[in-house]
Protein backbone atom coordinates (compact mmCIF):
# COMPACT_ATOMS: atom_id res chain seq x y z
CA UNK A 1 0.00 0.00 0.00
CA UNK A 2 1.20 3.50 -0.71
CA UNK A 3 1.74 6.24 1.82
CA UNK A 4 -1.53 7.80 0.76
CA UNK A 5 -5.16 7.11 1.58
CA UNK A 6 -7.80 6.10 -0.99
CA UNK A 7 -10.09 9.14 -0.77
CA UNK A 8 -9.65 12.88 -0.45
CA UNK A 9 -11.86 12.88 2.63
CA UNK A 10 -9.68 10.27 4.39
CA UNK A 11 -6.58 12.23 3.43
CA UNK A 12 -8.06 15.46 4.79
CA UNK A 13 -8.99 13.88 8.14
CA UNK A 14 -5.63 12.11 8.53
CA UNK A 15 -3.68 15.24 7.59
CA UNK A 16 -5.68 17.70 9.66
CA UNK A 17 -6.04 15.56 12.78
CA UNK A 18 -3.15 13.10 12.99
CA UNK A 19 -0.21 14.16 10.80
CA UNK A 20 2.66 16.00 12.47
CA UNK A 21 4.46 18.95 10.93
CA UNK A 22 7.94 18.01 9.67
CA UNK A 23 10.14 21.10 10.03
CA UNK A 24 12.98 19.89 7.81
CA UNK A 25 10.66 19.00 4.93
CA UNK A 26 8.32 22.00 5.52
CA UNK A 27 5.23 19.78 5.26
CA UNK A 28 2.97 17.46 7.20
CA UNK A 29 3.47 13.71 7.43
CA UNK A 30 1.77 11.53 4.85
CA UNK A 31 -0.27 8.52 6.03
CA UNK A 32 2.70 6.14 5.86
CA UNK A 33 4.87 8.43 7.98
CA UNK A 34 2.09 8.87 10.54
CA UNK A 35 1.66 5.10 10.82
CA UNK A 36 5.44 4.62 11.12
CA UNK A 37 5.57 7.16 13.97
CA UNK A 38 2.80 5.27 15.75
CA UNK A 39 4.50 1.90 15.23
CA UNK A 40 7.89 3.18 16.44
CA UNK A 41 6.57 5.05 19.48
CA UNK A 42 3.74 2.81 20.65
CA UNK A 43 3.73 -0.70 19.18
CA UNK A 44 7.50 -1.26 19.06
CA UNK A 45 7.76 -0.48 22.78
CA UNK A 46 5.88 -3.71 23.55
CA UNK A 47 6.36 -5.88 20.45
CA UNK A 48 9.94 -6.86 19.56
CA UNK A 49 9.26 -9.30 16.72
CA UNK A 50 10.03 -7.51 13.42
CA UNK A 51 7.67 -9.77 11.47
CA UNK A 52 4.77 -8.92 13.78
CA UNK A 53 5.64 -5.21 13.68
CA UNK A 54 5.65 -5.27 9.88
CA UNK A 55 2.37 -7.18 9.80
CA UNK A 56 0.70 -4.67 12.14
CA UNK A 57 2.07 -1.72 10.16
CA UNK A 58 0.82 -3.17 6.86
CA UNK A 59 -2.61 -3.88 8.35
CA UNK A 60 -2.91 -0.25 9.48
CA UNK A 61 -1.62 1.11 6.16
CA UNK A 62 -4.12 -1.07 4.29
CA UNK A 63 -6.94 0.08 6.59
CA UNK A 64 -7.60 -3.50 7.69
CA UNK A 65 -7.31 -2.50 11.34
CA UNK A 66 -7.29 0.86 13.11
CA UNK A 67 -5.46 1.65 16.34
CA UNK A 68 -6.69 4.13 18.89
CA UNK A 69 -6.60 7.34 16.90
CA UNK A 70 -5.81 9.34 20.03
CA UNK A 71 -2.65 7.20 20.31
CA UNK A 72 -1.86 7.89 16.66
CA UNK A 73 -2.33 11.62 17.25
CA UNK A 74 -0.13 11.79 20.36
CA UNK A 75 2.53 9.15 19.57
CA UNK A 76 5.96 10.67 20.05
CA UNK A 77 7.09 13.49 22.37
CA UNK A 78 3.62 14.24 23.80
CA UNK A 79 3.01 10.66 24.89
CA UNK A 80 6.60 10.29 26.12
CA UNK A 81 6.11 13.33 28.34
CA UNK A 82 2.89 11.94 29.87
CA UNK A 83 0.92 9.05 28.45
CA UNK A 84 -2.34 10.38 29.92
CA UNK A 85 -2.87 12.12 26.58
CA UNK A 86 -3.21 8.72 24.86
CA UNK A 87 -6.44 7.82 26.66
CA UNK A 88 -9.94 8.78 25.54
CA UNK A 89 -11.44 8.70 29.01
CA UNK A 90 -10.68 8.11 32.66
CA UNK A 91 -12.53 7.77 35.94
CA UNK A 92 -11.93 8.70 39.56
CA UNK A 93 -13.86 8.75 42.81
CA UNK A 94 -14.15 12.16 44.49
CA UNK A 95 -12.83 10.97 47.85
CA UNK A 96 -10.04 13.48 48.43
CA UNK A 97 -9.52 17.15 47.66
CA UNK A 98 -6.68 16.06 45.36
CA UNK A 99 -9.32 14.48 43.11
CA UNK A 100 -10.06 17.95 41.75
CA UNK A 101 -6.48 18.74 40.74
CA UNK A 102 -6.10 15.24 39.25
CA UNK A 103 -9.28 15.78 37.22
CA UNK A 104 -8.00 19.16 35.99
CA UNK A 105 -4.63 17.70 34.98
CA UNK A 106 -6.28 14.81 33.13
CA UNK A 107 -8.61 17.24 31.32
CA UNK A 108 -5.67 19.46 30.34
CA UNK A 109 -4.07 16.37 28.77
CA UNK A 110 -7.14 16.08 26.54
CA UNK A 111 -8.61 13.04 28.24
CA UNK A 112 -12.20 12.97 29.44
CA UNK A 113 -12.89 12.44 33.14
CA UNK A 114 -15.80 10.59 34.70
CA UNK A 115 -16.22 10.86 38.43
CA UNK A 116 -18.24 9.39 41.25
CA UNK A 117 -19.87 11.48 43.96
CA UNK A 118 -21.40 8.52 45.78
CA UNK A 119 -21.85 8.86 49.52
CA UNK A 120 -19.05 6.40 50.38
CA UNK A 121 -16.60 8.67 48.53
CA UNK A 122 -17.72 12.22 49.29
CA UNK A 123 -17.94 11.55 53.04
CA UNK A 124 -14.14 11.20 52.94
CA UNK A 125 -13.69 14.81 51.78
Q: Predicted segment positions?
A:
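Extended catalytic cores of very large enzyme megasubunits
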Residues: 1-125
Amino acid sequence: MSNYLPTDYQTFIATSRYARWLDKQKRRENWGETVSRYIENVVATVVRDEIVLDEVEQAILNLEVMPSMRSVMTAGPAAERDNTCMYNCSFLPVDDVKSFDEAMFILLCGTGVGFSVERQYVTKL
